[in-house]
Regions:
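Short glycine/acidic-rich loop motifs that flank beta-strands on beta-rich extracellular proteins
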Residues: 36, 56-59, 138-140, 154, ...
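Intrinsically disordered, low-complexity Ser/Thr- and acidic-rich flexible linkers and loops
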Residues: 107, 237-243, 297-308, 336-339
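Conserved small/polar residues in nucleotide/adenosyl-binding loops
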Residues: 384-388
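Right-handed parallel beta-helix/beta-spiral solenoid domain characteristic of secreted/periplasmic
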Residues: 48-63, 70-78, 82-117, 149-206
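Feature marks extracellular polysaccharide-active and adherence modules
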Residues: 29, 50, 131, 151-153, ...
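Solenoidal tandem-repeat scaffolds enriched in leucines and small polar residues
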Residues: 246-247, 265-267, 271-274, 278-295, ...
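Short "repeat-start/strand-capping" segments in structured domains, especially the N-termini
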Residues: 41-43, 144-146, 182, 213-216, ...
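N-terminal extracellular ligand-recognition/capping segment immediately after the signal peptide
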Residues: 9-13, 23-59, 116-167, 191
Length: 388
């Protein structure tokens, strides 16, 4: 426990001078205006918000700072947080999120306040819980870090970017700065992209991107109307004898609907499990598959043992329907320099393909078991190295 308890006020004394003790508990009972200044919190301090206490109008730099508060606004929407922060649970209401987004019945944006700054602030914490609402984001590419849990509380996140290549949430890639990111859980929210509103045609605006990381669980999510994929997994970061593959990813009870390119794409990964997911209504730009397992067509001949592959992917109890392309497309590439297939060990069990199909080629060891494949005029089952 902190040896010192300091009450912070908007007194004549500068705010920074009131934050001058490491490992102290600072009690904030009233509105603190930082007057557009940068204020650094001493190392290991605790900010305890009580009554109507909140901080506004400036930049607050944490230093292993813990926040304690009831479910009230404690950081106004004109606060920028930097540095390192923690809380037992960080609630979205702390950060002045505005749940005023209005969309029509198809998900098209009508109006709403931008919550991009609030999202950047809350993502500095590890354990996030959103109050159920409909939130609008004008910007995107929100970076997630290791050891993070995001519980959306059944909220809707509506994002609207004018860029041709972006994603709503990104794991493992901060605009080219690669970093292995591990132990992440995302659950209980819906992402709605701007496929219906935008006249900018692209295939690279994804709901969630897992570029590089391990031990990642997505559960009870919906990702739809993105101008790329609902979920993208993969990268082309190559080094000899170093594995940069996203790995050990579980996708459970998720729905990928009405996306522009694919419901989900895997271009590089090892150990991915889809359980109880739906891939539906993909339409826009080829391949337009429900799920596409397809390495990018790049030259890996200069690298030894670069681990560029799609391997050990399991699809169980999933549903594929009404995709303009294949239900499941597995498109292998040529063998690597060691003569090995780079798409290996694909297992499909107890799944339904309604007005869809499975197309697979250029791979080794694919097993399809106990599936219903209800094809239409487009449907077929074509394969290479497939055991059914």
């Amino acid at each position: 426990s902190q040896a010192n308890i300091v009450f912070v006020t908007n007194s004549i004394q500068p705010i920074q001078k009131q934050f001058n003790l490491s490992y102290a508990k600072y009690v904030i009972k009233s509105n603190i205006n930082l007057m557009s200044q940068n204020v650094v919190i001493p190392e290991g301090a605790v900010l305890c918000f009580v009554d109507s206490g909140r901080i506004e109008n400036g930049t607050l730099i944490g230093n292993g700072t813990k926040v304690m508060a009831q479910q009230n606004v404690v950081f106004s929407d004109n606060i920028l947080l930097k540095g390192s922060w923690k809380a037992d649970t960080a609630y979205s209401i702390w950060f002045d999120f505005k749940s005023d987004c209005i969309v029509d019945s198809s998900g098209r944006f009508i109006s709403g306040s931008d919550n991009s700054q609030q999202m950047n602030n809350i993502l500095l914490f590890d354990n996030l819980l959103f109050n159920c609402g409909v939130y609008y984001f004008k910007h995107a590419n929100f970076q997630l870090h290791s050891d993070m849990i995001i519980d959306g509380g059944n909220s809707v996140f509506k994002w609207n970017t004018s860029l041709k290549a972006d994603c709503f949430m990104a794991i493992g890639d901060s605009r080219g700065k690669w970093a292995g990111t591990s132990n992440i859980q995302l659950k209980n929210f819906t992402i709605i992209g701007n496929k219906l509103e935008s006249d900018i045609k692209t295939e690279q605006c994804h709901g969630i991107c897992i570029r590089y990381g391990s031990n990642i669980i997505l559960s009870n999510l919906q990702s739809g109307f993105n101008r790329g994929d609902g979920l993208y997994i993969g990268n082309v970061y190559l080094e000899s004898n170093i594995d940069h593959s996203p790995s050990y990813i579980s996708v459970i009870n998720c729905i990928f609907s009405d996306n522009h390119r694919q419901g989900s794409s895997i271009t590089r990964a090892n150990h991915v499990d889809f359980l109880g997911c739906k891939f539906i209504n993909t339409n826009g730009t080829p391949p337009q598959a429900g799920l596409d397992i397809e390495p990018n067509d790049i030259n890996i001949s200069a690298y030894e043992n670069c681990y560029y592959a799609c391997e050990n992917i399991r699809i169980n109890n999933c549903f594929f329907s009404n995709n303009a392309g294949n239900g499941l497309l597995v498109a292998g590439r040529s063998k690597n320099r060691e003569g090995k297939y780079i798409v290996n060990n694909i297992f499909v069990n107890n799944s339904v393909f309604d007005r869809g199909n499975i197309r697979a080629f250029g791979l080794k060891n694919m097993q399809v078991k106990d599936c219903d494949i209800l094809t239409d005029s487009y449907g077929s089952v074509s394969y290479t190295h497939l055991r059914a």
